[in-house]
Regions:
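PLP-dependent enzyme catalytic core of the Aspartate aminotransferase-like
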Residues: 2, 122-123, 131, 149, ...
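Conserved PLP-enzyme active-site core in the AAT-like
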Residues: 2-5, 17-21, 84-315
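N-terminal "arm"/small-domain region of PLP-dependent enzymes with the aminotransferase-like
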Residues: 2-64, 72-73
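Conserved N-terminal alpha-helix of the aminotransferase class I/II PLP-enzyme fold
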Residues: 42-91, 116-124
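Well-ordered beta-strand positions enriched in small/hydrophobic/aromatic, beta-favoring residues
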Residues: 154, 222-224, 321, 347, ...
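Active-site beta-loop-alpha junctions enriched in small/polar residues
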Residues: 159, 188-190, 326, 352, ...
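Short hydrophobic/aromatic beta-strand micro-patches
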Residues: 225, 348-350, 410-412
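Conserved small-domain helix->loop->beta segment predominantly found in fold-type I
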Residues: 275-278, 282-284, 289, 293, ...
Length: 431
């Protein structure tokens, strides 16, 4: 019987992918392998690598050893079988969808997703022959009714953007699997420290690693994690890209070649090969530095956020706080169930008044930076209706509960008293 013990999250985030020192140099820190290409031992070795018969480095567009450590570590933290790092979160989402969606296919997506992903689905993919249905993820009957014969995926986020709505992943997974389609979950705002969607039935998890994983607003990156549980071959006609012969690999079937890791293997071998949204070794290394302190930072983010929510709830100039920790929030009970340690450091509130009052508050808010990123160690603020979600129509904004009075906060890890004082001061400018 094995005596090997299962390591816990805080240990995994430091050691996976480099359990021993670097074999070439004995360096304890993960090296930056700043190279474009790799030497093959002989011609047969090169042919086996290109033919997917031997796993390993081929060319820098596809793999890199620094990148590999990062991929393995995120996959382990999420409880997946394999990971793929790419140049940005947007690339991760795009590749995950393109991997199974073809001309004539259909996707069902939640209505509270990130504005960029919403545009990808409703505008960009739709020009490529992919139809869509946008649904309220709380309305399970609506979700199920939206699934068609040509539906290839159900897509949602752990926490909605920007209002921090909570997704019932277990229920969506049940619906998706009843119709033999995968559930793809963006866990950027949840982080694997607070929730692991694969354990709740998700099949594929995507991240903008730019956010909590990196944590410092310094590097772009995205990650796709393969849960390894969806049976692509049992649904071969629905998922030919994974379960039928691949023309550019002489008829190889990814579900056979890569087994449980078929999903990310095909993205790497086909989509990344052909379109090249490659993460740089340096960015992968920077994101690894962030990953090593993920649990510590997220704990502080959550502590501060809950105190800010409490403060805003009592502020007479605030009309509503959109956070599931608030007892009156429709997702409050689900939030307590899925996030016993809290969560949701990115959320919105509606100021009394409208755009004028929201802008007045934002423009006088110290410490908080006015920018489009979130999940930085530094606190951030923005007006979603005129920035991150400005591509949406007035009707779409209202459907997502984003109003002229809505302000989005991303709470950092500063001293909470300093943050409360800054908020209090900014409210004095709102008449």
């Amino acid at each position: 019987m094995s005596t090997e013990k299962k390591l816990r999250f805080e240990t995994l985030q430091l050691h996976v992918g480099q359990e021993n020192p670097d074999p070439a140099t004995d360096a304890r820190a993960v090296p930056i392998y700043q190279t474009t290409s790799y030497v093959f031992r002989n011609s047969q070795h090169a042919a086996d690598r290109f033919g997917l018969r031997d796993a390993g480095n081929i060319y820098g567009r596809l793999t890199n050893s620094t990148q590999g450590v990062f991929e393995d570590r995120v996959a382990a933290l999420e409880g997946g079988v394999a990971g793929l790092a790419v140049a940005s979160g947007a690339a991760a989402v795009t590749y995950a969808l393109q991997n199974i969606l073809q001309n004539g296919d259909h996707i069902v997506a939640a209505d509270n997703i990130y504005g960029g992903t919403y545009n990808l689905i409703t505008h960009t993919l739709s020009t490529q022959g992919v139809s869509y249905t946008i649904v309220n993820p709380r309305n399970f009957e609506q979700v199920e009714a939206a699934i068609q014969d040509n539906t290839k995926a159900l897509y949602a986020e752990t926490f909605g953007n920007p209002n921090s709505d909570v997704t019932d992943i277990d229920k969506l997974a049940e619906i998706a699997h009843r119709h033999n389609i995968p559930l793809i979950i963006d866990n950027t705002f949840g982080t694997p420290y607070l929730i692991r969607p694969i354990e709740h039935g998700a099949d594929i998890v995507v991240h903008s690693a730019t956010k909590f994983i990196g944590g410092h607003g310094s590097s772009l990156g995205g990650v796709i994690v393969d849960g390894g549980k969806f049976d692509w071959k049992a649904n071969a006609d629905k998922f030919p890209t994974l379960a039928k012969p691949a023309p550019s690999y002489h008829g190889a079937v990814f579900a056979d070649v890569a087994g449980a890791a078929a999903f990310v293997t095909r993205i790497r071998a086909v989509i990344l090969r052909d379109t090249g949204a490659t993460i740089s070794p340096f960015n992968a290394w920077i994101l690894l530095q962030g990953l090593e302190t993920l649990s510590l930072r997220v704990e502080r983010h959550v502590q501060n956020a809950l105190k800010v929510v409490e403060y805003l709830e009592k502020n007479p100039k605030v009309a509503k706080v959109n956070h599931p920790a608030v007892p009156s929030h429709p997702d409050h009970e689900l939030y307590k169930k899925l996030f016993p340690n809290g969560g949701g450091s990115i959320f919105t509130f509606d100021i009394k008044g409208g755009e004028k009052e929201a802008w007045e508050f934002i423009d006088h808010l110290r410490i908080f930076s006015l920018l489009a990123n979130v999940a930085d160690v530094k606190s951030l603020v923005i007006h979603p209706a005129t920035t991150t979600h400005s591509q949406l129509s007035p009707e779409e904004l209202e459907e997502q509960h984003i109003y002229p009075s809505t302000v989005r906060l991303s709470i950092g890890i500063e001293n909470i008293d300093d943050l409360i004082e800054a908020l209090d001061e900014a409210f004095t400018y709102v008449k």
